[in-house]
């Protein structure tokens, strides 16, 4: 998997270098989008003790300025880390909840992520290490918890299976809060604001969601981008009327297809999409 992603990232770099010779196409974010949302960390549905402790540490990091420094490193803005938010679902105390002790006893906190989701968590093509905003936050949480952080790349479409099967302890990777996820997991307080945006080549005839009718639209399989498009029934049905929703395992590959002209538009998290445009 690591080798495949490395090849994909290398291919993306090659595309960008080729495009820079003789005038490269530019890509823009449309003002119209599929709505605002927020990111949260996902825990197993009844792992309240672990969730409470991780949130307590994050609140401490917010108060002592650590979260702000990490935010400034990745976003150039200390205020990108949200404060004053509430849990999407009420915190509870459950008899027999040993979720925190389970992590402390094994000495590791296993973080599940899609390793191609910059700048939240992604594999650096130069060092081979997984880095990102979420990774830096999680490293500090693990240090204060007194355990080792283990980063476990997963198939994003199977994230809940990985979580409930105890292959990972939490999902921490720019995961958008949705009603379905709130019902199936226990979510932390929101910590980053986001939106589902539309990216197109500069000069494209696509100016709004309505213009996606009959077009090929790229997005990540199992993502909140897909959920957002499907939730907008009018736009979704218009796309399928002569067009196609093209699903990819990761956002980098989806972006490659946009650059190659195989799709007409790319729907993706604002945080990720803006990073891709800025860095490529």
Sequence positions of predicted segments:
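Sec-dependent N-terminal signal peptides of Gram-positive bacterial secreted proteins and lipoproteins
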Residues: 2-22
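Hydrophobic residues within well-ordered alpha-helices
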Residues: 41, 54, 141, 163-164, ...
């Amino acid at each position: 998997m690591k080798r495949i992603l490395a090849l994909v990232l290398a291919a993306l770099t090659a595309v960008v270098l080729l495009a820079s010779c003789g005038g490269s196409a530019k890509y823009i974010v449309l003002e119209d989008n599929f709505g605002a949302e927020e990111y949260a960390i996902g825990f197993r549905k009844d792992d309240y003790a672990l969730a409470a402790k991780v949130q307590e540490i994050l609140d401490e990091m917010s108060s002592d300025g650590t979260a702000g420094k990490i935010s400034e490193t990745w976003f150039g803005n200390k205020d990108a880390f949200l404060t004053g938010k509430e849990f999407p679902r009420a915190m509870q105390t459950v008899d027999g909840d040993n979720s925190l002790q389970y992590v402390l006893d094994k000495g590791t906190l296993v973080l599940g992520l899609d390793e191609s989701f910059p700048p939240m968590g992604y594999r650096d093509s130069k060092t081979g290490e997984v880095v990102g905003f979420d990774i830096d936050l999680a490293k500090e949480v693990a240090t204060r918890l007194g355990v080792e952080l283990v980063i476990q790349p997963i198939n994003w479409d199977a994230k809940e299976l990985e979580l409930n099967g105890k292959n990972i302890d939490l999902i921490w990777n720019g995961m958008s809060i949705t009603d379905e996820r709130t019902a199936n997991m226990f979510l932390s307080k929101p910590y980053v604001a986001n939106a589902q945006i539309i990216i197109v080549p500069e000069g494209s005839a696509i100016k709004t969601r309505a213009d996606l009718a009959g077009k090929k639209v790229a997005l990540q399989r199992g993502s909140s981008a897909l959920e957002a498009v499907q939730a907008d029934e009018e736009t979704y049905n218009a796309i399928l009327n002569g067009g196609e929703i093209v699903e990819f395992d990761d956002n980098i590959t989806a972006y490659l297809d946009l650059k190659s002209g195989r799709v007409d538009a790319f729907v993706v998290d604002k945080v990720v999409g803006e990073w891709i445009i800025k860095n490529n």
